[in-house]
Structure formats: C-alpha cells, structure tokens
C-alpha cells in the first residue's frame, strides 16, 4: 500500500522569495528612472523657457506616478507578508483539527 503524498509548504521561503522579487523589481524600476533622468539632464540646459516648463510639468507627473508605483510595491510586499502569515495560521488550525 502506497502512502498518500504529503503536500507541504515552506511559508517563510515562499514569502521571502516573493518579497525579494518585489524588491528587485522596485530597484530595477528606480534604477531605470534614475538612468533616464541622467540622460535627460544635459538636454535640459538647451531647452527654452517654455520647453523647460513643459518638461518640468511632465516630469512632475512621472515622479508622482513613480512614487505611487513604489507605494503599491511596498503595499504588495506587506500584503505578501501578511498573507503568508494568514496561510501558515490556517495550516496550523487545519493540522490542529486532526489532533482532536
């Protein structure tokens, strides 16, 4: 008679991996934005007053959007942490039900 397969998870490892991927994604995103800023910086010196003002208005929108995305990534990382805690707790409760 074959034993039933056991389904098990390492909740800490799953949480760590997902949160690490979120952190890596945020770092790549912010590095790309910084690279873009450094490439645009020399051009800004050549722009007329109107062009500079137009760029500044758009750059402010980009900055706000980037900040919002970074906040979303932070919230996502926190949700992953809390979700992993919730799943681990549910698993312990389920295991406890069999111990009765």
UniProtKB/Swiss-Prot annotation:
Question: Native species of this protein?
Answer: Mycobacterium tuberculosis (strain ATCC 25618 / H37Rv)
Query: Where is the protein found, in the record's own terms?
Result: Secreted
- One Gene Ontology cellular component: extracellular region
Further information: Elicits strong humoral responses. Induces significant lymphocyte proliferation and up-regulates the induction of TNF-alpha and IL-6 in tuberculosis patients.
SUPFAM superfamilies linked: EsxAB dimer-like (SSF140453)
Family indicated by similarity: Belongs to the WXG100 family. ESAT-6 subfamily.
Q: Which Pfam families match?
A: WXG100
Provide the gene name from the record: esxT
SUBUNIT field: Forms a tight 1:1 complex with EsxU. Complex formation results in induction of alpha-helical conformation and stability against chemical denaturation.
> Which Gene3D superfamilies does its entry note?
ESAT-6-like
**What protein does this entry describe?**
ESAT-6-like protein EsxT
Q: Does the keyword rRNA processing apply?
A: no
Please describe what this protein does: Induces apoptosis of host cells via activation of NF-kappa-B.
**Alphabetical keyword list:** Secreted, Virulence
């Amino acid at each position: 008679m074959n034993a039933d397969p056991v389904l098990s998870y390492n909740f800490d490892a799953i949480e760590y991996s997902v949160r690490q991927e979120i952190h890596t994604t945020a770092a790549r995103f912010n590095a790309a934005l910084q690279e873009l800023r450094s490439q645009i910086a020399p051009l800004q010196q050549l722009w007329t007053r109107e062009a500079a003002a137009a760029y500044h208005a758009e750059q402010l929108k980009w900055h706000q959007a980037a900040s919002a995305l970074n906040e979303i990534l932070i919230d996502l990382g926190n949700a992953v942490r809390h979700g992993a805690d919730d799943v681990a707790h549910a698993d312990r409760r389920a295991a406890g039900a069999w111990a009765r």
